[in-house]
Amino acid sequence: MKKKILVIEDEEDIANLVKLVLETEDFEVQTVLDPLGAVDTVKRYQPDAILLDLAMPGLNGWEIFKRIRNDADIVQVPIAILTAKAQAFDEMVGLHVMKADAYITKPFGKQELIDKTHELFRKKTH
């Protein structure tokens, strides 16, 4: 059975690119462009992992992240942060303070996206 990935990204071109790349790795991928409905989509879709953009209008990625982590039904889903914030401090906050499972900076390469997505599942099994 294919692993299900939910991509929460307001930029349609980026969301479609991520979807295309991950589908070549035999993942089932769904995208959410509107951050306001993201948490409900997580509950409905029940993904095995989430790739979450931080800078979105209306509801930012950190707020979505907190809502997922505070919901008993979906708290266990691994989350990789997608962001243009490439400073070491930002990554430290994402991984060590917020407890994201991975941190992917934009622009990212195809192989980095693939590797970090696979890593989400290796972490989940340990």
Which role does the model predict for each range below?
Residues 9:
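Conserved acidic carboxylate
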Residues 16-24:
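Charged docking surfaces used in two-component/phosphorelay signaling
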Residues 26-33, 41:
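Short hydrophobic/Thr-rich beta-strand motif most characteristic of the beta2 strand and flanking loop
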Residues 45-51:
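Active-site beta3 strand of CheY-like receiver
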Residues 53, 83:
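Active-site residues of response regulator receiver
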Residues 56:
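Receiver (REC) domain active-site loop signature in two-component systems and cognate sites
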